């Protein structure tokens, strides 16, 4: 029974991570009406940038600071890509939009290969979330438990942003 519970919790953690990625993709599609194939590549770029920043910034502040700074850096890159690549194809047929975003994937992947190389990079776990919690004798990573707890708050915050704020009204009107 303990293994079953551990598997359920692992599934919930994976679902939480996928929810976060999918909600970003859904928001971007809702605003731009472009299926952005490069969405995952921006997550990859954020992971690499975060990894590099963690090598420079020390300790716990370095980890969380690197995560926030990587998000800002990739966000700025995303804005540049939107202005330079996506805006010119908004009125084009969907096939051109897909080809444009696929081209962005290729560029980001090649840049990542040039900068970080083909070797897998393993970054540190989040400070305070490195251990496991035993549930009915089965180990469940603390990171998974944190993800399960955080996901409903993110879902609520997104719901509130979209339905109760001026920004949300503008996003829904787009």
Where in the sequence are the language-model features?
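Small-residue-rich transmembrane alpha-helical segments that form helix-helix packing/gating elements
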Residues: 1-32, 37-174
């Amino acid at each position: 029974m303990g293994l079953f519970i551990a598997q359920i919790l692992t599934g919930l953690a994976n679902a939480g991570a996928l929810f976060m990625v999918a909600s970003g993709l859904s928001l971007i599609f809702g605003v731009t009406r472009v299926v952005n194939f490069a969405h995952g590549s921006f997550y990859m770029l954020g992971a690499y940038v975060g990894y590099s920043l963690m090598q420079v910034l020390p300790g716990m502040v370095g980890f969380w600071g690197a995560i926030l700074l990587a998000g800002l850096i990739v966000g700025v890159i995303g804005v540049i890509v939107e202005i330079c690549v996506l805006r010119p194809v908004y009125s084009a047929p969907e096939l051109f939009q897909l080809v444009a975003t696929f081209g962005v994937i290729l560029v980001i992947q090649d840049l990542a290969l040039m900068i970080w190389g083909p070797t897998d990079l393993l970054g540190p776990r989040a400070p305070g979330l490195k251990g496991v919690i035993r549930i009915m004798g089965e180990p469940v990573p603390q990171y998974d438990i944190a993800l399960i707890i955080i996901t409903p708050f993110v879902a609520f915050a997104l719901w509130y942003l979209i339905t109760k704020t001026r920004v949300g009204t503008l996003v829904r009107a787009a």
